[in-house]
């Protein structure tokens, strides 16, 4: 497991979602699901509905030569898009993993041990983990989780609350 940095730019355009960084199909679909969820809640953040027709959103995951795939970055991409759209900063010491649904539910992921180790090595103090992965935590040594706050999340609302500064 490695941590991925996710960059999002919003610019005037025609409502396109641009995805770069050698992303696989599942990861691209995850980004699409994330933007659909963000659009559905954008009114809560005073984002006008026409915003999404008048702007393009570009998601880039650096190290473009390295292939990336899977649904695990779904909540992270959704949060990054919401942050870029609302100009609301995200804490620098938080990592997260989880598949996102159209309704903002957070679904379980695989490889939790490796992901937590990568987060620890990257200096993260807090990690949002799907509640459905709680059973996997018992198999992970305290050496890895020591000094880290593990937040078990079921919905994007919890992720947003934990991550926004």
PLM regions: where:
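Peripheral, non-AAA+ core regions of ATP-driven protein-machinery
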Residues: 2-165
């Amino acid at each position: 497991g490695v941590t991925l940095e996710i960059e999002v730019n919003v610019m005037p355009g025609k409502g396109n979602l641009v995805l770069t960084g050698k992303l696989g199909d599942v990861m691209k679909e995850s980004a699409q699901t994330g933007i659909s969820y963000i659009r559905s809640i954008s009114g809560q953040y005073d984002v006008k509905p026409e915003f999404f027709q008048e702007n393009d959103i570009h998601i880039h995951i650096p190290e473009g030569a390295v292939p990336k795939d899977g649904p695990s970055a779904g909540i992270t991409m959704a949060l990054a898009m919401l942050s870029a759209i609302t100009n609301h900063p995200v804490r620098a010491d938080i990592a997260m993993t989880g598949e996102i649904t159209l309704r903002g539910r957070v679904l379980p992921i695989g490889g939790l041990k490796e992901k937590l180790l990568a987060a620890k090595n990257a200096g993260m103090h807090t990690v949002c983990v799907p509640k459905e992965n709680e059973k996997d935590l018992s198999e992970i040594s305290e050496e890895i989780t020591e000094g880290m706050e593990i937040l078990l999340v079921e919905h994007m609302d919890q992720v947003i609350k934990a991550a926004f500064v």
